[in-house]
Each structure stands twice: as structure tokens, then as C-alpha cells.
Amino acid sequence: MNTTPDTPTPRALRELTPLEARIVGVLVEKQHTVPDTYPLSLNALTAGCNQKTARAPVMSVSEDEVTTALDGLKHLSLVMEGSSSRVPRFEHNVNRVLGIPSQAIALLTILLLRGPQTAAELRLNSARLHGFADISSVEAFLDELAARAQPLVVRLPRAPGARENRWMHLMCGEVNLADFASADAGGADSVPPSEFEALKAEQKRLADEVARLNALVLRMASELGIDVDAQGDAS
């Protein structure tokens, strides 16, 4: 499914930290969504890492933390620092280092920024980076990424009640699929204590309301001389 000619040879990489992965995702995203301000300054890059929307998990990192992570990414050649501006600016080098086409980069970027996604979610959320014709084309590129000698993504076990499998990036290391399946199953079958207490309170409120309405009906029936029990037997 690789449609990009002369794709560079991929390099083996160490596992990234969560912040390093976030930085890579932000740089690719902003290259497409705000091209006029790309490459990004340290301030803009930090803001992108701490962005509240289209991020999972939401982070709160400092410029010093981003600078440290950038040093690691520059050592891996995943990020380059420009020298033509008084303000240091940073750009990604994902296509050359990983040796994957732009379509695959778009999907990987969404996984880096938003966490596990279904193929349908990836198609929707990657629209500003690349427009996929259909879900099958998304799955084809995901399959390629998963089949590499050093896989970049993995298909997760389907959660109970879910219609589709989700995909997860492996840039931060391998995941234990059995643990992931157990976590999904536990999340589907159990109710958090706070939610359970809220349900109990709502049940009591409804029971009290039914009792109040029942008493009101009996009182009104008595005032009108209606025998409620007789009416019930007749029905």
C-alpha cells in the first residue's frame, strides 16, 4: 500500500518517552494545520503539547521539559533545529527516519496525539493531515505499519460490546495485549464507586416519588369515593 516512491530506508529506534512521542505528533500535526508558523518555536511547541483538545492524555509540561525531550529527539534525528531564525525553531524528520509514506505518518500522528483509535476514528481524525477514501485504505496502511520488522502499531483486542478493534502506536514500547484486554473487560463490566452511589441515590429518589404519587392517587380516590382495589379487580 506504500504509494510514496523512493521511501527512505527505516532506522531502528529506541523507545520514546511519552513527551517525546507527543512532540513528534505535535510537529507533524502543526506542519499541516498551521503551515505559516511551521517550523515551531519552543513556545508554540510547548503549547501544542499542553493543548486541551485532540489530546489523550492531556499533558502539562514546561519549556524546560520540552527542551530536554527535544535533545533526545535530535539525537535520534527525529527532530531538527533550524538555524535561519533568531528564535530557535523545530521541525520533524519522521518520513526519513521511519521510512514511511505520508499516509502512514498521518495515522501514526493521530495515534501519538489521541491514543488508541478505531480505523473509522483514524479516518475521521486524520482528515486535516490526509484524506483517506475509505476505511479499508486506512486499515491497509495500518497493516503495513504493524507488519514491519520493528512494528509501529498494533491491533488491540476488541473490547466487550465494541464493534471494531482499536489500534495503538508502539513508539513508546510494546504493550501486553492480555493486560489490555483484561482492562477493557473490567472497564465494561464494573461500575465506578461514585457512579454506583449516584445510581443508588437515583433509585431511592424514584422510589420515593412513586410512593408519593401512590399516596396522592389514594387520597384523591378516597375524596371521589372510588374504590381503587375494586377498580383493580375489575380490570
UniProtKB/Swiss-Prot annotation:
SS bonds (residue pairs): none
A Pfam short name: DUF480
- Extract the InterPro entries matched here: DUF480 (IPR007432), WH-like_DNA-bd_sf (IPR036388), WH_DNA-bd_sf (IPR036390)
Entry's Gene3D superfamilies? Winged helix-like DNA-binding domain superfamily/Winged helix DNA-binding domain
Coiled-coil zones: none
Give the family per the record. Belongs to the UPF0502 family.
Please name the PANTHER family in this protein's record.
UPF0502 PROTEIN YCEH
Q: By what name is this protein known? A: UPF0502 protein Bcep18194_B0081
Q: Which organism is it from?
A: Burkholderia lata (strain ATCC 17760 / DSM 23089 / LMG 22485 / NCIMB 9086 / R18194 / 383)
